[in-house]
Amino acid sequence: MPKMKTKSSAKKRFKVTATGKVMAGQAGKRHGMIKRTTKFIRDARGTTTLSAPDAKIVKGYMPYDR
């Protein structure tokens, strides 16, 4: 049986930690930030952990990053 392929778009956007959690960048920061509150902008920095159902889907895209 041939090797499974990793989705190139997923490996660029997500990172699986050593404990199995999936990290992703915060969404909603591309444009329109002038009308956002300072708290929103501050809280949207860095990365966030995906929820369990979303993490399961993303792990399916990256079979060798578990």
From Swiss-Prot:
Biological processes, Gene Ontology terms: translation
Keyword line: Ribonucleoprotein, Ribosomal protein
GO annotations of cellular component type: cytosolic large ribosomal subunit
Record-linked InterPro entries: Ribosomal_bL35, Ribosomal_bL35-like, Ribosomal_bL35_CS, Ribosomal_bL35_sf
GO molecular function, one term: structural constituent of ribosome
Keyword Ribonucleoprotein found: yes
Ribonucleoprotein recorded as keyword: yes
Family: Belongs to the bacterial ribosomal protein bL35 family.
Protein name from the UniProt record: Large ribosomal subunit protein bL35
Organism per entry: Ruegeria pomeroyi (strain ATCC 700808 / DSM 15171 / DSS-3) (Silicibacter pomeroyi)
